[in-house]
Amino acid sequence: MVPAESNAVQAKLAKTLQRFENKIKAGDYYEAHQTLRTIANRYVRSKSYEHAIELISQGALSFLKAKQGGSGTDLIFYLLEVYDLAEVKVDDISVARLVRLIAELDPSEPNLKDVITGMNNWSIKFSEYKFGDPYLHNTIGSKLLEGDFVYEAERYFMLGTHDSMIKYVDLLWDWLCQVDDIEDSTVAEFFSRLVFNYLFISNISFAHESKDIFLERFIEKFHPKYEKIDKNGYEIVFFEDYSDLNFLQLLLITCQTKDKSYFLNLKNHYLDFSQAYKSELEFLGQEYFNIVAPKQTNFLQDMMSGFLGGSK
């Protein structure tokens, strides 16, 4: 498209958006919605995808700001259709556009989970990330947490950015502190989520950092008896009364070494925990030590199923 034609189209698009905004301000939501969709359809049919995307995304944003969640989310779904049709790749601009929309979504919006699943499916399809874009995950996790979708938020934080990792630790720590009667095993229930989930996705760095933050908070709040010991160059916080926390720390280090004999010795030494975490250890045995499990366990497949809205 030559510059003059491009400028003309941009001017026309600007006028369309201005008329749309005027209808929104007047409360004429239905007509605004139908008119915008009709014009966007023309852009899509002529393969003017950039203009369609700009029109649809701005329209969705305006509806969300006007607290018209139904129309806003309808346009988000349409935007994702155009993203797919135009094969829009994951980059700073395409993700930022979605992040702006997520920020405006009401946490109680009935379509929230479907919108998020659609966004993430696009980022899986058009990025190098197996589970989708981490930056998008960070924003999604925060919005889900606003809506009290704690388990869903956990999944997205786990696969997000470094900031997401901090939020994930905060989430689990706050969760633990809400427990009325904390028993010895209660702490490990929450701590194990960090260790196992990061090991499942082979994020050793976040596993170590989240472990350190969590245990530091645990020591500061509950004052358990402990000593720090060096294990082959790795530091372990050895707890006198929390052997499950010791086991989980040693498991992390063992997976990092990828030494099969260490793994088997660890399981034999902590037989109770080996049984309690049987499925998780079978999967880690497959992933880190090439130990074929009697029954194949695939936590990553389960995770992917959850991301894709239940599909395999």
Curated annotation (Swiss-Prot):
Query: Where is this chain's protein located in or outside the cell?
Result: Cytoplasm
Please, which domain of life does this record's source organism belong to? Eukaryota
Q: What InterPro entries would the database entry show?
A: GET4, TPR-like_helical_dom_sf
Q: Do the record's keywords include Repeat?
A: no
The UniProt entry's GO CC annotations, sorted and at most eight, read: cytoplasm; cytosol; TRC complex
Its Gene Ontology biological processes? post-translational protein targeting to endoplasmic reticulum membrane; protein insertion into ER membrane; vesicle-mediated transport
Assign the protein's first listed, main location to one coarse class.
Answer: cytoplasm
Note whether Cytoplasm occurs among the keywords. yes
| Keywords, alphabetical | Cytoplasm, ER-Golgi transport, Transport
List, alphabetically, the Gene3D superfamilies matched. Tetratricopeptide repeat domain
Q: Which family does the similarity line name?
A: Belongs to the GET4 family.
Protein role: May play a role in insertion of tail-anchored proteins into the endoplasmic reticulum membrane.
Assembly mode: Interacts with MDY2/GET5.
Q: What else is known?
A: Present with 5350 molecules/cell in log phase SD medium.
Q: What is this protein called?
A: Golgi to ER traffic protein 4
